Amino acid sequence: MPLPKAELHLHIEGTLEPELAFELAARNGVELPYADTGELRKAYQFEDLQSFLNLYYELMAVLRTERDFEDLANAYLARAAAQGVRHAEIFFDPQAHLARGVPMGTVVEGLWRALGSSEANHGISTRLILCFLRDESAESALQTLEAAKPYLDRITGVGLDSAEVGHPPMKFREVYEAAAALGLRRVAHAGEEGPPEYIAEALDVLGVERVDHGLRCMESPELVERLVRDRIPLTLCPLSNVRLRTVDTLAEHPLPTMLDAGLVCTVNSDDPAYFGGYVGDNFEAVQGTLRLTEDRLRELARNSFLASFLEDDEERRARYLSEVEAYEF
């Protein structure tokens, strides 16, 4: 769906399509345990978040050089542009690369070779968000932030992702305080598999400005009331929720109920290569299955720009919003 939109919940490593994975494996002499792209695609069947993460980290082995990260980002940007994305705030997971001996500079500089020219090449403005892996230690997160300091002119904010259960936001209080002191924006995954209390903790302890996922807020009327009152955006990922069994079927997704409650919801793709759809595909899926009206779809697109970190360029944001209003379905 080419409705103009911003994508705010997108893991760049999760855009690694099987074809590119094999291309990079051949380039770097990495042997993948799959005969071909078809066999690899069949492996994209997940029972839960952890089974997805196991494959996600396994395939990262093909990402070695600046050129690899540049090619990965450009492949995403080309697909996103074709689906109406005008602005993208892109997550990356440096700890997973540092652990493999890939330096922070290789990752950031490689991504920036694509992001720095994304407006000229793809018509998309971008921001880069460094995510900490919550199943790693708080000390590792602090070390990662320290390693990122030479590149903060290219990093807009920090996030928190990976396995949620058993890793509450409180664990990362210190690194989020350090990030805030550096002037970085703050978001965090919360309330996907973890309980509603993790959402409140992310707000109260980490000071996040957006909640990534946040689906389980619906279990707490008090939390919903707070999110509505404070206009805290939620970056929902419907096809991801189905694939990871957060909801049983798309028809059962609470997005319509959340919108009716006044929550500031956005629709995003999460890890589109693994979950069977980019952001435009997610829009089409919720339109068809959840029967969202054109007004609701326009609201989702409008929310995506309003929830973005474009405060430093209000003229651009206003232009994007006018494109949403002018769009004809």
Predicted regions and their residues:
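Metal-cofactor-binding active-site regions of metalloenzymes
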Residues: 1-184, 193-198, 205, 209-210, ...
